[in-house]
């Protein structure tokens, strides 16, 4: 994550001179990230699928709710890290030849590095607020990549369309998150640091059965999260 973010900034000086180096630097970095992802997956498997996490850092305190930033590695996360870095590596290797001669060659690899960093951050997020922030960053990168050749009307139109569609889905996801945040005491005793979907799936029906919330609220939260998943397709098209 850190290396991809750094590369997105470091290759900026190559925009005008030595643009070819941008592709090689980016590919070298993502190759190292892919190897580390494989090592992470092997470590998780050797530990019997034990979840690995780091003590989260408090980022923002809102009333009784603490918004933290952390890293969470479990078997699913380890697998997704391998997939994200592996696919990104193949795309970037192909792009070295495909983008050869393009005047915005270095800018493309800068966007790809930021996109990869955003996806990695999304995968390893330890709480839903962090997840949402990285998801929005993924949306920004998707918009930049889809509209990369912004001077072409078709690319500009496609980027705007993808941006609008994903914003609609994200709005539903945001509403669901806000409801969970302001009712954290009901669902998890104020603890929003779990990304385990089974926790939410169990907490919502139990809260409804206990009469703490209405069943209609559970339905609307589910619709909000579902709309978010539905809006993801245009973003993956850019990868």
Task: Describe the residue ranges of each PLM region.
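...captures the hydrophobic TM-helix bundle architecture rather than a specific catalytic motif
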Residues: 1-239
